[in-house]
Amino acid sequence: MLHNNTAVPPLLEVSGISKQFSGVMVLKHIDFTLFPGQIQALLGGNGAGKSTLMKIIAGLEQPDKGTLKISGHHVSHLNPTKAHQFGIYLIPQEPLLFPNLSVQENILFRLPKHQVDKSKMKQLLALLGCQLDLHVSAGSLNVADQQLVEIMRGLMRNSKILILDEPTASLTPVETERLFAQLRELQQQGVGIIFISHKIPEIYQLADQVSVMRDGTIALSGKIRDYTTDDIIQAITPAAKDQPLNGTPKLGLDLSNNQHQTVPDRPILTVTKLSGEGFSNISFSVKPGEILGLAGVVGAGRTELAETLYGLRPAVSGEIKLKQHTVNGLKTAQRLAQGLVYLPEDRQSSGLFLDSSLGWNICSLTHNRNTFWIRPAYDTAVLERYCQILNIKFSHINQPIKTLSGGNQQKILIAKCLEAHPAVLIIDEPTRGVDVAARNDIYQLIRHIAQQQVAIIFISSDLDEVVRIADRVLVMHQGEINGELTKQQMDVDTIMHIAFGEHKPQQAASC
């Protein structure tokens, strides 16, 4: 690590950076410094300005005021090509790979010919302690390996500054530790790393410096060892401390007029010996008002199962019953009309229409069902109702959803699912890329929805939140249910053991 040497000049100096969009100041006189061999965690609430600051550093946005110095050189009119030339590489939360190209082709894509060095690529893989098959398609990799490919793309371009945006959002603890080991190795080589995260415990494992943004300013900055968790949470937002889930939150959300009639003590969804791509022989049931957790490592088959239940993938065998009626032969739209609603893991590519307005997105599942015509006034009324209920922050009603922060995008996606009046709501990674305060909003909302007799299947890689939210949990391993735990039985360690197939406990009583 080089950053302890005060004689070493900074890799990056940001001075007085300001930026506004549509008259709204999103960055206000930001100062930020990164040294060689330093891992600096960057935290902040949704809309705090983290993404805008990183886009400016990566050349994707231009500042209105302020200066950037890279390795001591003043830089103006930075664009992505120049940023790469200066050794800056941004690794997005969702890896941007070509799924049909090989790993090697993705790593070398658009690399200048004089930098195409396959022996160097293999040396870097060895340095990171990885054994990637360079000839398989990138689309066949799990998220952890896709992120490694993105890191390799940066290193092959001689990057000295790596920006990682929520890299552990969909990783298991084991995959997270493997990534951390790789980042520590890069740190030893003098690479400066900006590590954006909403998971406070993990920054204490990895970072040596921390900066917290709030309302477009730096609210806290310094050595990580000088701050407690409470200090960081307070800097993110004074009201962001975890709230207990006891009692009924007064959110103003009323699903009592839900068109789907349910019987509280009778399972509303029953799955029997279901097999499909990525999973086999799955059987379970869920009752109205129950939150059923679905845990497992990446590749265990959770998302594949959810997409099959919703009709996005075909079932090979087995039966799905919704309200005592088999739905195997029904299309997705028909299952939706019967009250089966799915909130996908990837909100940007699968859940939202990024160039469309907020209200249009919320009502998009019901437009075709209710009327051929799109009704702007109706969409606006629905938007205003959900924005008040879910505390969604936006500038104007016609604002494209792609301009919102990740947490507000996720709340819009939840509102879209609720507007479809679910009887069964399948939620896949609902807090991915969401800050502490927004997570608590979502936890409270999920509990409130369940209290109104909606059955919820809750998929998450964050085992702490599975334990916190779920009434019961099914743990998948290699495409099968390897264990079932009641609320009293579940804890993170037990779930982890089952998820890795180490033991299969006695099954909890089926509900």
UniProtKB/Swiss-Prot annotation:
Catalysed transformations (reactions): ATP + H2O + (2R,4S)-2-methyl-2,3,3,4-tetrahydroxytetrahydrofuran-[AI-2-binding protein]Side 1 = ADP + phosphate + (2R,4S)-2-methyl-2,3,3,4-tetrahydroxytetrahydrofuranSide 2 + [AI-2-binding protein]Side 1
CDD domains per UniProt: ABC_Carb_Monos_I, ABC_Carb_Monos_II
ABC transporter domain sequence ranges: 12-240, 263-503
Name recorded for this polypeptide: Autoinducer 2 import ATP-binding protein LsrA
Enzyme class: translocase
Record's keyword annotation contains ATP-binding: yes
Pfam families, per database record: ABC_tran (PF00005)
Lineage of the organism: Bacteria, Pseudomonadati, Pseudomonadota, Gammaproteobacteria, Enterobacterales
GO-annotated cellular components: plasma membrane
GO molecular function terms attached to this record: ATP binding; ATP hydrolysis activity
Underlying gene: lsrA
Keyword Nucleotidyltransferase part of the UniProt annotation: no
Membrane topology per record: Peripheral membrane protein
Biological role: Part of the ABC transporter complex LsrABCD involved in autoinducer 2 (AI-2) import. Responsible for energy coupling to the transport system.
Binding residue positions for ATP: G44, G45, N46, G47, A48, G49, K50, S51
InterPro entries documented for this protein: AAA+_ATPase (IPR003593), ABC_carbohydrate_import_ATPase (IPR050107), ABC_transporter-like_ATP-bd (IPR003439), ABC_transporter-like_CS (IPR017871), P-loop_NTPase (IPR027417)
Keywords: ATP-binding, Cell inner membrane, Cell membrane, Membrane, Nucleotide-binding, Repeat, Translocase, Transport
